[in-house]
Design a protein with these regions (language model features):
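Receiver (REC) domain switch/active-site residues of two-component response regulators
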Residues: 187
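Acidic/aromatic-lined carbohydrate-recognition and catalytic surfaces
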Residues: 1-175, 179, 183
Length: 188
């Protein structure tokens, strides 16, 4: 398995940023290396708070990297070269700009939209302290406070709120995402 970070792999359009078409262009090179599978690091729309792991839309290509047509052409070229395509799905969290998190912020505490994430009331007389002392992998508290006083969990950057895997909506959303990419030629 050959991991590719599309943003830095090969720039076809000359904008200084690697792109999906660049992966397609280098398919013969990958085949000649003996690669039998490529693993694409996140290439989804993102504000790049964490190198693309802060995903805004799991079912699209970041427009800076290309289009869905570019992705489909890349998957087809890979398969013609005998190379499988694996995409990096990030199921721990979304970006804070993901539609689900925006709905959660607009919703009341305890609502179904909030339940897609891990929201908690804070400690202290006025809830001014995080729910616990957990630390983010990036340093600092793993909790961020929102305008209504509740806190949400982010084990990574605060732009990456953790999803609640006890919520069936999250299961369904990621099943839809996996089906989507399977329908677009991915092998894993």
């Amino acid at each position: 398995v050959y991991q590719i970070y599309p943003r830095s792999f090969k720039d076809v359009n000359g904008d200084g940023l690697g792109d999906i078409a660049g992966v397609t262009e280098k398919m013969d090179y990958l085949k000649n290396l003996g690669v039998d599978a490529i693993w694409l690091s996140p290439f989804y729309p993102s504000d790049l708070a964490d190198g693309g792991y802060d995903v805004i839309d799991y079912r699209n290509v970041d427009p800076r990297l290309g289009t869905m047509d570019d992705f489909d052409a890349m998957a087809e070229a890979a398969h013609e070269a005998g190379i499988k395509v694996i995409v990096d799905i990030v199921p721990n969290h979304t970006a804070d700009k993901h539609v689900f998190f925006q709905e959660a912020l607009a919703a009341e505490p305890g609502s179904p939209a909030r339940d897609r994430y891990i929201f908690r009331d804070g400690r202290g007389e006025h809830g001014e302290l995080p729910p616990n002392d957990w630390q983010s992998f990036f340093g600092g508290p793993a909790w961020a406070r929102v305008a209504d006083g509740q806190w949400y969990l982010h084990l990574f950057d605060k732009a990456q709120p953790d999803v609640n895997w006890k919520n069936p909506d999250i299961h369904e959303e990621f099943k839809k995402t996996l089906r989507f990419w399977s329908d677009h030629g991915t092998d894993g």
